[in-house]
Amino acid sequence: LSNPDIDYIAFSILNIPLAYGCESNNPTQKYLSRLHFMNRLEDEGLFPALLGKRVHFLGMTEGPNEISLMRGFTDFIDTWDSSAAVWAGLNGIKFDSSPTGLSQGKFEKEVDFSYKVGDNIRLAKDNINYIEELCYAA
């Protein structure tokens, strides 16, 4: 963190669960892994070193409500990308009020970038609005 050549750090849905040995077959552990990682950074007193850096969250673990889990860390998270809102919506899945925001678990179908947008565009937009509301509440 003290290297001045590093100005952007990515926290992935792959590398953090992998570091904790919970990258597969354990959605609850995976869902909580980045929160656990952020808490460890805080406990180790590493956040002051992060203030001069930008942190990017790659993807979402098991649902959009992971955003709410990070509510205490918004000063450190610069950006967060995910196709979850659009991809779930286009496939007929609506984010919900369950603990993760996806009561049936993460939609695992690989994103098809040549997908033809059809009837579910409204649902995709609703999911985007759901995420925006989470972000503004954080």
Predicted features by range, described:
Residues 11-13, 57-59, 84:
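A cross-domain feature marking catalytic cores of carbohydrate-active enzymes
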